[in-house]
């Protein structure tokens, strides 16, 4: 989309092969659905850093409520000038390696990536598979780009996930923190985890 907009600005028209519909947030989901001839709900989720996790929770909800037998869920993130400009305006991009929770932290490193999961209802754990044991969500609605300082939203999400999975804090061996290496996020996340 960004290159097409540049061509529009310089040439007065979009490239011949430009298709607006592939710029839509749901375009990757629509493409995959057509590729595998999927039936049922097809949509994209955009909730910033939580989008891929939210997609897995949404897939689990579809399965749990018998709205689907099999769901392809995951996430993709492309590095665009819009993304770079956004993080630069927040002054959160590090010029060094990302060091969450470290004293000399100075921000994140951003890149591209994608992952997809095929999820089915009540699939036992096998050597080649994993199971989503539980999930938890919250919204502290504190600020568009800053978490609530006391970490209560993140803590509520983790508590809901533990309850959903029928686990206790002592059952957890690893926490995959958001870990942005920004002062506000790291302080909040440390409080929530503690």
Where in the sequence are the language-model features?
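Conserved catalytic cysteine-centered active-site region
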Residues: 1-8, 17-58, 83-109, 190-194
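Conserved small-residue
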Residues: 32, 52, 59, 87, ...
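Beta-strand segments within the central parallel beta-sheet cores of soluble alpha/beta enzyme folds
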Residues: 43-46, 71-76, 129-135, 170-177
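Acidic, glycine-rich active-site loops and adjacent beta-strand->loop/helix elements
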Residues: 47-51, 75-80, 136-140, 179-181
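Condensing-enzyme catalytic core mediating Claisen C-C bond formation in acyl metabolism
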Residues: 97-165, 174
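Short glycine/threonine-rich loop-to-helix capping motif typified by GTGT followed
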Residues: 144-151, 180-194
């Amino acid at each position: 989309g960004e290159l097409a907009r540049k061509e529009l600005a310089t040439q007065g028209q979009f490239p011949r092969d430009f298709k607006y519909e592939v710029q839509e947030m749901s375009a990757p989901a629509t493409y995959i659905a057509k590729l595998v001839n999927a039936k049922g709900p097809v949509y994209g989720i955009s909730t910033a850093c939580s989008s891929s996790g939210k997609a897995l929770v949404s897939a689990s909800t579809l399965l749990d409520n018998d709205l689907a037998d099999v769901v392809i869920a995951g996430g993709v993130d492309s590095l665009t000038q819009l993304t770079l400009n956004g993080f630069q305006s927040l002054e959160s991009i590090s010029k060094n390696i990302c060091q969450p929770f470290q004293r000399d932290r100075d921000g994140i490193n951003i890149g591209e990536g994608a992952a997809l999961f095929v999820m089915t209802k009540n699939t036992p754990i096998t050597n080649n598979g994993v199971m989503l044991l539980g999930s938890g969500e919250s919204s502290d609605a504190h600020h568009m780009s800053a978490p609530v300082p006391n970490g209560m939203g993140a803590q509520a999400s983790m508590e809901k996930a533990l309850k959903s999975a029928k686990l206790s804090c002592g059952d957890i061996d690893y926490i995959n923190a958001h870990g942005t290496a920004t002062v506000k996020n790291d302080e909040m996340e440390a409080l929530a985890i503690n």
